[in-house]
Amino acid sequence: MGGRKRNVRKMALAVIGIAGIVLACYFLLVNFLVSAALVPSFMKRLQAFERITNEGYAAQVQTEDIQENGRAALEGTKEWLKTVQRQKVSIQSEDGFTLVAELFPRTDNHRWVILLHGYTGWKEELYPFAYWYHEEGYQVLAPDLRCQGESEGDFIGMGWTDHYDCLLWIQYILSLDEEAEIVLHGQSMGAATALMVTGEEALPSNVKAVISDCAYTDAYSMFGEKIKEWFGLPSFPFVDSACLALRLRGGYNLKDASALEAVTKSRTPTLFIHGEQDAMISVGMSRELYEAAAWQKELLIVENAGHAQSQDKDPDTYYGTIRVFLDKTLAKQE
């Protein structure tokens, strides 16, 4: 009898030990997923940036007109950068990180634009937009989002921590120009960031409009898609577990990073733009955001454009639509 009890006890301890090992391996895997997607230093060791670059290229439409227009925009931007006045500026985030931006000032009016880049991007990617806005008479602020480019950070914010940082950049502009009329123009994750900003009750009335180019509806859905695509793992239970790990390690929850929820509360006029053939963020997401938006809104779908390519596929329509939308919106609020 005593021997049987000892055997049962040994079996129970063995089961507990195996369960503990499985659980530990599971949480190691979950933490690996978080680091592989959101920690640039870890991503670099995994050569994840090369994978993301290749994925981004695959999500684009490679046609001669897009490539030609893109090259022309870059050449024009290079010439502009040789002579334009600019300066590097920085602020501190609420959690103590130094955030860096490039400022392109003007002195002839109070119109401003904040340019917000995408996932694993940097401010220089949006300099062609800075060139266009500056020529249109806007003062331009182009930040590196946290943990990217020259800005410090521990985790990529997927728009959530970034939108709090953007609120600080807005306050920075207001410290320079109390009468500033501010436009937020974001691409991809930067667009989702801009939309999340407008969902804040404390948003200063100086923020007059948003240009949302190829935004996703929410980071939770995007993370689930990428886990499946990159690692062949199902969303459940890994995404929820990753949310818990990120909350413990990074201080935020992916479920909070919802542009879709923000637009239902927004009182900021918004122009939604998306490439019809975007293979990275479905055009359906911008349509969903547009339908959910509760305030003045417009939607531009650019045919035969891939991810973040609308401006190169049809620059006249892209920038012309933005110009008309902003002139109308800003004039209405003056």
Residue map of PLM features:
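Catalytic histidine-centered segment of alpha/beta-hydrolase-like enzymes
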Residues: 305-319
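Short beta-strand/loop motif that positions the catalytic acidic residue
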Residues: 265-267, 272-274, 278
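Hydrolase active-site cap/lid region
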Residues: 196-253, 301
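Alpha/beta-hydrolase active-site loop
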Residues: 125, 156-177
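An N-terminal hydrophobic leader/cap segment in hydrolases
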Residues: 24-92
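Short alpha-helix in the alpha/beta-hydrolase fold that links the catalytic acid
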Residues: 259, 268, 282-291
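The serine-hydrolase catalytic nucleophile loop
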Residues: 119-132, 145
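Conserved alpha/beta-hydrolase
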Residues: 132-152
